[in-house]
């Protein structure tokens, strides 16, 4: 066994010891401990790394776990913003799971590290009961692609999905802005860009597979309107989305 494999086994053992202690301390903890044993065995069978999400000292194991997705992980003050969102989720009675919360196992290459991050994030989504996704346009006119994947993952898993954006202008409006207003309707009434490529024109916040996919499942996409210099730090829309999620998850 190499050093990385030994480190993974030690990490798994420490997490199981922590969960066992919580199970002993809390009346309803044994069900949660059994749940994690099943997940560990599943991971072993698939040769995947076992991850148990952080559990507060005093927790209710019936608390809904919500995966907080968004491009905040790329910000220079990522830890600050992620911690603020997590604190708000806890105050609302939810247990937050967020990319960046857990240590990534050691790898030997960038490609392996990318795969390890993907595995950890997907494991958290499997453990989560719902998702709140930040669909604020990122590095372009559309939502962060990683967040879009995570939203689709949770939709496909049949779990409750909620989202918000800090940009009020809809998708077609942002495409128009990208081309300096040079979009127009053709003879058949289809909106097209200067290259003749059709533009989605449904009045939605983003691609219809995201916005409509959320609403078809009973979720909501909250539309905020943050200042340009606070697109990824303004949490007003997140708070509104969080309140809706709490109500619907009861």
Q: What label would you give each PLM region?
A:
Residues 33, 49-50, 57, 61:
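Aromatic (phenylalanine/tyrosine) cluster motif
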Residues 8, 26-31, 44-46:
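Short linear/disordered segments characteristic of secreted peptide precursors
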Residues 6-17, 27:
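Hydrophobic, low-acid, alpha-helix-prone terminal segments
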Residues 56-250:
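Conserved catalytic or regulatory cores that recognize and/or transform ribose-phosphate-containing ligands
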């Amino acid at each position: 066994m190499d050093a990385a494999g030994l480190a993974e086994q030690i990490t798994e053992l420490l997490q199981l010891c922590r969960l066992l202690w919580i199970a002993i301390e809390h009346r309803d903890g044994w069900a949660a401990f059994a749940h994690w044993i099943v997940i560990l065995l599943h991971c072993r069978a698939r040769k995947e790394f076992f991850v148990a999400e952080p559990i507060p000292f005093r927790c209710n194991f019936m608390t809904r776990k919500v995966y907080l997705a968004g491009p905040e992980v790329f910000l220079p003050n990522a830890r600050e913003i992620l911690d603020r969102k997590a604190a708000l989720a806890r105050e609302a009675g939810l247990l937050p799971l967020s990319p960046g919360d857990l240590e990534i196992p050691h790898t030997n290459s960038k490609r392996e590290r990318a795969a390890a991050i993907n595995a950890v994030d997907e494991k958290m989504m499997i453990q989560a009961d719902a998702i709140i996704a930040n669909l604020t346009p990122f590095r372009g006119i559309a939502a962060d692609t990683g967040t879009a994947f995570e939203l689709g993952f949770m939709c496909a898993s049949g779990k409750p999905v909620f989202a918000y954006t800090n940009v009020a202008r809809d998708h077609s409006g942002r495409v128009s802005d990208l081309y300096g207003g040079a979009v127009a309707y053709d003879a058949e009434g289809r909106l097209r860009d200067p290259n003749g490529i059709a533009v989605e024109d449904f009045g939605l916040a983003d691609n219809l597979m995201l916005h409509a996919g959320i609403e078809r499942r009973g979720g909501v996409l909250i539309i905020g309107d943050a200042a340009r210099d606070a697109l990824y730090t303004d949490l007003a829309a997140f708070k509104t989305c969080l309140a809706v999620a709490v109500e619907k998850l009861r």
